[in-house]
Amino acid sequence: MAKNNTNRHYSLRKLKKGTASVAVALSVIGAGLVVNTNEVSARVFPRGTVENPDKARELLNKYDVENSMLQANNDKLTTENNNLTDQNKNLTTENKNLTDQNKNLTTENKNLTDQNKNLTTENKELKAEENRLTTENKGLTKKLSEAEEEAANKERENKEAIGTLKKTLDETVKDKIAKEQESKETIGTLKKTLDETVKDKIAKEQESKETIGTLKKTLDETVKDKIAKEQESKETIGTLKKILDETVKDKIAREQKSKQDIGALKQELAKKDEGNKVSEASRKGLRRDLDASREAKKQVEKDLANLTAELDKVKEEKQISDASRQGLRRDLDASREAKKQVEKALEEANSKLAALEKLNKELEESKKLTEKEKAELQAKLEAEAKALKEQLAKQAEELAKLRAGKASDSQTPDAKPGNKVVPGKGQAPQAGTKPNQNKAPMKETKRQLPSTGETANPFFTAAALTVMATAGVAAVVKRKEEN
C-alpha cells in the first residue's frame, strides 16, 4: 500500500494563497487535496497514503505558529501606520501654525512700513517748517538790526543838531550881548513884542512853557540888568531884540521841530523797542520752537533710526521666515511624498492583511475539516500503525535501492493541481521512499513564503516601505530642527 505513493509529488509553488499548508497537512495525514483555480476540494486517497500522525501534528503546529507570526506582524504594521498618521497630522498642524505666524509677521511688517512712511512725511514737514522759521527769523533779525541802526543814526543826528543849535545859540547870545549895548532904545518895543510873542507862543505851545518862562525871566532880568547897566546901548538892544526875536522864533521853531522830531523819534524808538521786544520775544519763541523742533527732529531721527533698525530686523525675520517657509515647503513636500509612500505601504499592508485574514479563515476552515476527519482517521491510523511497524523491516532492506533512485525521482515533472496523480506509473512503488520524498519539498519551502509559495524577497515589502517612510519623516524632522 505504501508503494502506491511513490510518484505523488505536490507543487507548493502552484497552489493558491493559503492552500499550500492545508494541502501538505492533509496529504501527510492521508486526506488528498485536489486544488482547482477557484475552489479547494478534498479527496480521500487510499489507505496506503497514511503517514506518521506525529509528523502531521508537527506540521499543523508549525502552520499555527506561522499564522500567529503573520498576525503579530500585521498588528505591528497597523501600529506603525497609526504612528505615521499621527506624525503626519502633527506636521500638518505645525505647518499651519508657521503659516499663520508668517502672515502675522507680514502684517506687522506692513504696519511698520506705513508708520515709517508717516514718520518720514512728518519729518519732511518739520524740516520745511524749520526752514521757514529760520528764514523768517533771519528776516526779523535783519529788520531789527536795520531799525537799531536807523535809531542810532537818528539819535546821532539829533545829538549833532542839538550841539549845533547850542553852539549857534551861544554864538548868537554872545553876538546879541555885544550888540545889546547899542539897542537900548528898542528894549521897550522888544519887551512888548517879546511879551506878545511869549504869550502867543505860550498859547500855541503848551509843551514849551517852562523853557519860554525861563527864557522870559532870563530875558527880563537881562533887559533890566542891561537897562540898569547900559543906558547907552538902546539902539544895540533894539537890534539885539530884533535879532533875539528872530533867533527866539527860529530857536522855538527849531525846538518845536526838534521836539516833534524827538517825539516822533521817541515814538518810533518806542515802536522799535516794542518791535524789538516783540521780535525778541518772537525770536525767543522761535528759538524755543527751533530748539523744540531740533529736539523733535532728533527724536524723530532717533525714532526713524529705531524704526529703520526694526524694519531691518523685520526684513531679516521675514527673510528667515521666507527661508523657513521654503524649508517648510520642502519638508511638506517630503512629508507628502513620505505620506504617499506610507499610504502605498499601508495599501500593500492592508492587501497582505486581507490575504492573511483570508488565509487565516481558510486555515480555520481546514482545521475544522481536519479535526472532523482526524477523529475518523485516528482509528484507521491506530489500526494501520501496526501494519506499518511490520513493514519497517521490509523497508529497511529496500532503503539502499531507494537512495540510488532518489535522483531520478527528483527529476519527475510536478503534478498539476487540477490533474489526478495515478499511482503505479513511472518508477516501481517502494515503501521506503516516502520519508526521502518529503524532505526535498521541505528544503524548497525554506526559500519560499509560507503562505503563497512565492520566492521570498527581502526588499520592497510592506515592512521595508514602512521603514523607508519612517526614515523619510525622521529626515524631515531633522531638517526642520536645523532650520
Swiss-Prot record:
Start and stop residues of the D repeats: 379-384, 385-390, 393-398, 400-405
Name of the encoding gene: emm6
Key words of the record: Cell wall, Coiled coil, Peptidoglycan-anchor, Phagocytosis, Repeat, Secreted, Signal, Virulence
Main location, first listed in the record: secreted
Places the protein is found: Secreted, Cell wall
Entry similarity comment: Belongs to the M protein family.
Motif (LPXTG sorting signal): 449-453
Region annotation (10 X 7 AA approximate tandem repeats of [KMNR]-L-[TQ]-[TDA]-[ENQ]-N-[NDK]) ranges: 69-138
A Pfam short name: Gram_pos_anchor
InterPro entries in UniProt: LPXTG_anchor, M_anchor, SMCR, SMDRR, YSIRK_signal_dom
Region of interest (4.5 X 25 AA tandem repeats of E-[NS]-K-E-[TA]-I-G-T-L-K-K-[TI]-L-D-E-T-V-K-D-K-I-A-[KR]-E-Q), ranges: 157-269
Name of the protein in question: M protein, serotype 6
N-terminal signal peptide: 1-42
Feature: compositional bias, Low complexity: 88-113
Biased composition (Basic and acidic residues): 122-135, 143-157, 268-298, 328-345
Coiled coil, from the record: 54-171, 280-408
Modified residues (Pentaglycyl murein peptidoglycan amidated threonine): T452
The protein's role, per its UniProt record: Mediates the attachment of S.pyogenes to skin epithelial cells through the binding of the human membrane cofactor protein CD46. Also binds to the factor H and factor H-like protein 1. These interactions could contribute to the fact that the M6 protein protects the bacterium from the phagocytosis by regulating the complement activation on the bacterial surface.
Classification via NCBIfam families: LPXTG_anchor (TIGR01167), M_group_A_cterm (NF033777), YSIRK_signal (TIGR01168)
